[in-house]
Amino acid sequence: MESESESSSTHSSCDRFLDAEDEFFYDSFSNHYDCLNSSPPANLRRRRLPMDTDSSSSSSTSSLESCEKRSTVGENDELEVSLVDFETIEIDVDVTDSANSSIDSISEKGEDFEVIDSCTDTEKNMGENDSGRVDPFTVTTLNDERGEIYTGPEYTSTDWSLTSLVIRSIEFQVSLMITFIRFPPWLISKCLSFVFDPYRTMRRGRRYLVSWIVGLCDSGLKDDKPVLELVRRVTWGLFCAVYVGIMLFALLVSAFMISGFVITYLAHEPLVIKESLNFDYTKSSPEAYVPISSCAGVAFGLSGKESIETGKVKGLKDRTEITVSMTLPESEYNRNLGMFQVRVDFLSASGHVLASSRRPCMVKFSSEPIRLVQTLLKIAPLVTGYVSEIQTLNLKLKGLVEKDIIPTACLKIMIEQRAEFRPGAGIPEIYDASLFLESKLPFLKRIIWNWRKTLFVWISMSLFIMELLFALVFFRPLIIPRTGQRTQQRDGTHSINNNLYLDGQAGSR
């Protein structure tokens, strides 16, 4: 009778569970095993509760029955699996009672014991009646402290620093250098292939061009978004390149202007005067005048050009050097003349002599046999007119340093004869004469003037680099335009990283 009653009770329980929905069994089955596997293995450990010897018989029988019933899961269908799982849950209640008694005995003995259920949320969903149940295979965590959610570093506009800009510029230069190195061999190979087999090269080029155009058209016909995105990026890149080029050109022009003002202020041009001399042979000692500022009050018959305006030349503030060049014919008169003298006078605006410098000179001597040999050797150029029988005398005279009291207004060049000649005699025959005057600057000013172009370039480049660094530090948006796409990509990447991190934290819990 007892067996019949037990069989009838089991059949009634089976009928009762057969009427339930399939989702209940699947949910209970999945929740039961999800609770056991939810915690990460790195932070978990399993403890098996010790059982008292007094309750060994009941626990052993219940565990044997549960093992036997669980062994039949692989042989039965899904419905039998759910029934067996439910029966094991009932049997686990007895096991938990025995475990509770063992926990009480351990606590009475003073031993430390910690049981933390990691499936609290799942058991609450299953029912509040099972909240006090303790599974002997309960997973306990070593650390239950929840850390604050790490959202990752926040990217701002200042992350794109000068370091990244320098690195990118270096990468661009390296890639450009590699391209320049690889381009000549590639071009030579293509040219040689075109020379040796032009038709094949033309066919390959046409095939490549057609395939590229067809691929572009296919991608545009299938989906116009990549093409539009490419066009948008190219347009925006060209606009940014033009904008950055205009800003850099403006900085470069400003640097050149400032450098020009600095060089104009620092570099002083030396006074250089080159004038042809027209001597007045109506006087006993022929004279010629060269104006520095003005010779109006000095003489009435000026020699040479009178186009130097008053006030254009500020005077001889530095030491000067004067060179008088005279072209004389190798005539018998000049060879027999011998010595004569050239004098240069520095005159004020009123005609007073401020300083004077003299230099004796003569035609170069050569004996009669030497002149004959030279004439024989130069007979052809002399006959054709390429060479003339002339001599050029360059007379260098020391100048003076002008005082601030009386400025120099004019120069007077005079040819003086020797004392043995009567007035008007002893004057050489001259084809042409000229004067070259140059002021000698101080050492530092001379270096600045001689290196003015190099200094201009160096100052311009230094100012340009300083202006560029100043603009990048304080006015970066003025040089580098901001892009909304970059900010959106950073925000999207940041949000995706945060979501993935939060999902991982939720899964670990």
Curated annotation (Swiss-Prot):
Region (Disordered) location: 33-73
Any single biological process term in GO: lipid droplet formation
Parts of the chain that traverse the membrane: 238-258, 455-475
Keywords, alphabetical: Endoplasmic reticulum, Lipid metabolism, Membrane, Transmembrane, Transmembrane helix
Pfam families assigned: Seipin (PF06775)
Top-level division of the source organism's lineage: Eukaryota
InterPro entries associated with the record: Seipin
Expression (tissue specificity): Expressed in seeds, seedlings, leaves, stems and roots. Not detected in flowers.
Membrane topology: Multi-pass membrane protein
Protein purpose: Involved in lipid metabolism and lipid droplet (LD) morphology, number, and size. Supports the formation of small-sized LDs and modulates triacylglycerol accumulation. Induces probably a reorganization of the endoplasmic reticulum into LD-forming domains.
Record-stated family: Belongs to the seipin family.
Entry text on domains: The N-terminal domain (1-230) determines the lipid droplet size.
Protein name per the record: Seipin-3
